Amino acid sequence: MMNRMNRAGRLWWGGLWLLLAAFASAEEAKTTANNPPKKADAGDFIRVRRDAKKTPLAMETAIVHYVPADKGKKSPTVDLVSAFHIGEKKYYEELNKAFENYDVVLYELVAPLGTRVPKGGGNKDSMLSKVQKFMKDTLALEFQLDQIDYTKANFVHADMSAADIAKSMSDKGETWMTIISRMMSYSMAQQAKNGGDDGSMELFAAFFSKNRPLALKRAIANQLEVNDTLSALEGPDGSTLISGRNAIALDVLKKQIAGGKRKIAIFYGGGHMPDLDKHLRADFGLKPGGTRWLTAWDLNDKAVEKKE
């Protein structure tokens, strides 16, 4: 019975990580970082903030500000704005306000070149939309495409189309099945390395919690700190889903800089950021100049804490 529960738990978590990877590109939040190291990791862009008792208080994403390494230059500046695609309404309101201050915001969206997202999101009847609605309702959160205003004049599409992804994957010998298998195998190996805890018991308890959305979000936050499944995609030649799409964004960045834009944001999932960081340093002569953290998920139940 317990073995069946554990297997079911692994399958559930494996499926959840694939969904979160698709929606959020989130990776392991390893450390806090006021001054990102020479080689950035995912913890510089997405982290779980905890109290002294190690209770998760917030899932946070970073806006990392890059400035010219040459002290004689003041521009261009580029901000890597990490996206968590399921979040609090207030989180997206903060992002919308921040985006008003940029000359241009380069955004990810697997769609034909130049695609614009209408206000309130796109097609609500698609299978993906139904999955999103289920997750939104279960976690009591909002979705990025519904809340971010992509109609603003300074928003520029900077991503592959589905056809581009299919061609790139074919050229690299990648398939969706091999990607899924690689990610799940890596995730299970990491679970074994961490004592075999797949989070199934915490998840099971969360479903029966008086505050189910909060309990589920905390369970997911705990798992994000022991899962780095997207790193399994990147090999010596990179991958379509990370470095391939990043290459498109960086090409658009070059064109925007050449066109005179000086204050630029790249709005992409956190899993893309270590590779983008590497290229901003090596190819654009930029370095991190500061980090601002935003709360994507509020995991603090003040009412419960007062009772305890």
Task: Annotate the PLM regions.
Residues M2-W13:
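Bacterial N-terminal signal peptides that target proteins for export
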Residues W13-A22:
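Bacterial N-terminal signal peptides
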Residues W17, T55-L57, I257:
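Sterically constrained small-residue positions within well-ordered secondary structures
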Residues A29-T240, G244, G289-L299, V304-E305:
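Structured, acidic catalytic/metal-binding patches in enzyme active sites
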Residues S239, S243-E308:
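A cross-kingdom marker for long, charged
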